Amino acid sequence: MKSLSFLCSIFLFCSSLSSKEPQLIPTGYQPLAIHAVADTIHVFCNGNDIDFDGVYEPLSGEKPAMWYIYDANTNVPVKAIIMQNGYFDVPFRPGLSSTRLYLPRQNKIEVYDLSTQELLDSSLLQLPDQKSKITGIHVVSTQQSGVSNDVALALSHKTSFTEPGQIEIYSLISRQTLLQKEVGINPQMIRTYKNLLGQMEFAVLCEGTFGGRNSALYVINTASGTGEPNMTILELGDTGNHFIIQDQLALTVMNGSHEIIPVNLATKTVLPSISVGTSGYDGPREIIVDTMANRVYISTYASDIRIGSFTDGTVIGQWFPKGKPEGMAFIKNSLWVCNAFKSGDYVPDSTIALFTLDESTFIQERAELSLEADISMHEGICIIKSQLEGEDIDYTVMNTKGTVVSQGTFNGKEHRLSFLGLPYGVYVITLNSSKLSSSTLVIFRD
């Protein structure tokens, strides 16, 4: 698990990384999301629905929703189609696998071939309630002999903006619903992860009502052994918009309260929130982590990308994509950014900003991070083994509340750290040296 220490200072922005000038690539109107598969890049654009009726009307000057495919080696578009069945929902939360696009359409799901853009099924699943609206899809896949197979869909849906929604697990094998559970108001994003026991858990971000401070992350474990799934509700803040999971840490983007709220998924604990520094309607949109370079990137409607270190809290800087950014992706040593709207305005933009990551730094940081440390616990003694010898290594032990309970420095390949006298529970051990930076989750128990 990566260090939580960056959360204390990442958004106190006084830029130390010089701003980069992006390369702008033309695309459709209002690009929302980017998805890379092998040597192709998929960009989903929502056009311009001038009267907001969901119907494309070219005679009124409207622009259609479109799906572009780019060559990842040349950054040139090779395919593009108009989405004939109308505009996308915002937030845009389709299900994407290595071969398929599962697109929510009110109470139905459309299925497309990802390489040919062919519509394979116009109604894979149809909810019985016509008022239901599918708001988010996540694809559960398995690997067999090196081949990825889509086995299930986790989908969220709602019937109103003020009542609780539902999460549903749908089998692509049996074409049956395996689980349905009530969650919070306006569920809109789903992710899966493996807990410390190796069990799959589903995390559902519920937006809540704007200004209501009732956004929540619902975590569901279907392997409880009781026949009834366990569900944990983690209260967040105002208007959750996006989240990522890195190891056992979820980082949730709160658009209404202008915060990033971290959640320790191992202990189901909400950690202290951090102000992003935006205000009004210019709040944070999405978050992405470069785990190799230990950097966090946050898109904001203040027309910038905010960057911080994921390891030690160092503020790195801001980049300006020349638009209001939405979705982001790392592709071939570049950060791709969707400019959904014009900078400082809400007129749909039609560009993607490419920021080339500094290659020398990029390679150097990855080489350093390949030096791993082995950490094990035995009878209350934590044994730390590194590949370094004769160099000082700083260590910090943090509990689930973010409190540092032990810290120090050792020199050599092995160090023994006593947990005796500390309460049983989960701790994060962070190591830092000139050549090593890593964090590990450990459990101290009887």
Identify the residue ranges that each predicted region occupies.
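Residue-level detector of functionally pivotal "anchor" positions at catalytic/ligand-binding pockets or at interdomain
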Residues: F355-I381
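Repeated scaffold domains used in trafficking and secretory/extracellular systems
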Residues: Y29-H35, N85-L96, Q130-Q143, I185-K194, ...
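Blade-level signature of beta-propeller repeat domains, shared across WD40, Kelch, NHL, RCC1
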Residues: G323-S360
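Short, surface-exposed loop/turn motifs with a glycine/proline- and acidic-biased composition
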Residues: G198, T403-K435
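C-terminal tail/sorting-segment detector
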Residues: C382-I383, Y424-D446
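Short coil/turn segments that connect the beta-strands within blades of beta-propeller domains
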Residues: A38-D39, S98-T99, S148-D150, G198-M200, ...
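A short beta-strand motif characteristic of beta-propeller blades
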Residues: K20-P26, V76-Q84, E118-D129, Q176-E182, ...
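Short, conserved, GDST-rich strand-edge loop motifs in beta-rich repeat architectures
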Residues: C45-P64, N149, L155-T162, L205-N214, ...
